[in-house]
Amino acid sequence: MRQEAYFCTVKELDELGKNNIPRQLISHTHLIYSSPATLAFNSPGAEGFGVKRAGLAVPDSVMLIVSPGCCGRNTSVLSSMRAYQDRFYYLLMDETDIVTGRHLKKIPKAVAEICEGLKKKPSVVMICITCVDALLGTDMERVCHKAEEYAGVPVRPCYMYALTREGRKPPMVHVRQSVYSLLEPKKKKGNVVNLLGYFSPLTDDCELYDLLHGAGVKTIHEISRCKDYAQYQTMSEANFNLVLHPEARFAAEDFHDRLKIPYIELRRLYQIDKIASQYRALAAALGVEFEDEIPRKAAEEAVEKFREIHPDAVFAVGEWMNGDPFELALALVHYGFRVSEIYGTLSGENFVYVKQLAKISPDTKVFSNLEPTMLYYDKSQSGVNMTIGKDAGYYHKECSNVLWLSLIHISEPTRHLRIS
């Protein structure tokens, strides 16, 4: 085995092209190294919004986890949080269940038993299943339909399939579709908009709220701000949806097909000029003009202040944070900083940033967190003195680290840089 961590420079990747990304940087082509840097990534119930926590985004919902005992153990971390007490239930599978699939017949009864034991009838029961049922080929839609008929409550599937992580519809894409599937058609209101993509709200002082209000929008819905199921249902009244995360596209398409609500996508960007261009495009689509000079100036001043304090900053940018590591690295280079290393998952979608980086920072190295040779990662020649992302912080423990992982999402791109 190679005794050093595999990497490519962005210049080398650009020369290879997006259709020839080295197999070492594509995780489904090799053995997976469960690096300590990505433990939270590999254990979605342990931190942030993994499949299980996201599945409970619908107010008054509960979840039945159908799995072998080893798959559900990390849920105990979530169960200890006040907001999730008495919302997780388990149907454990034994070896016979795995061989015969008999556990599927138990699910409707388990759902009914959960509902009967609760003081308040749940709005929906989410059935969370694991890779075991993926390998068995379980038709979970059919199972949920039977459970719904048996228990008399809505039942929806929630797939915790690590096997489909890099497929057409990964678990976090599917769960977003599931949590909005309960919405029923309502009369549309021209001054209502939904924000789709996150399971926690934007910061209260996010400029997006002011821009939308200035455009005549009176009500902005986010699933995380819905206090009860009735308020959740008012999301069907929206005139249009704003998609803030690409994993919400399927959900937005479902909105369009079922509820006739169109959508506009806004990407999470950290290049101030690109953010301004995106806002201009949104304003043009809505037939209005946005006044974004104040937040833009604040962002530019934050960058300048940070550059004055840390003129010699050399960054390592990880993927375990709120953003695309390649786009963020490109933004940092544009702001005058050096980016020595990126730890990320390359795709055709973010390869455009690699091409741009190759022109202005050709020696930036790209590593894959899940590549086995990361066992031999050596930081000694990197020159890094600042890191962004939990994974980057793991590789450079002695450096200043910004987790950039707040559950309350910050839209203004450089507010994270306001550190001394």
What are these regions (language model features)?
Residues 211, 224-238, 331, 340-394, ...:
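Glycine-rich, anion-gripping cofactor-binding loops and their flanking helix/strand elements
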Residues 408-420:
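Single conserved hydrophobic/aromatic residue that forms the stacking wall/gate
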Residues 251-271, 336-338, 377-411:
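A short, gly/pro- and small-residue-rich
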Residues 67-73, 101-105, 126-141, 162-173, ...:
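Gly/Ser/Thr-rich loops at beta-strand to alpha-helix junctions
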Residues 83-86, 208-220, 330-339:
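Short helix-loop-beta junction
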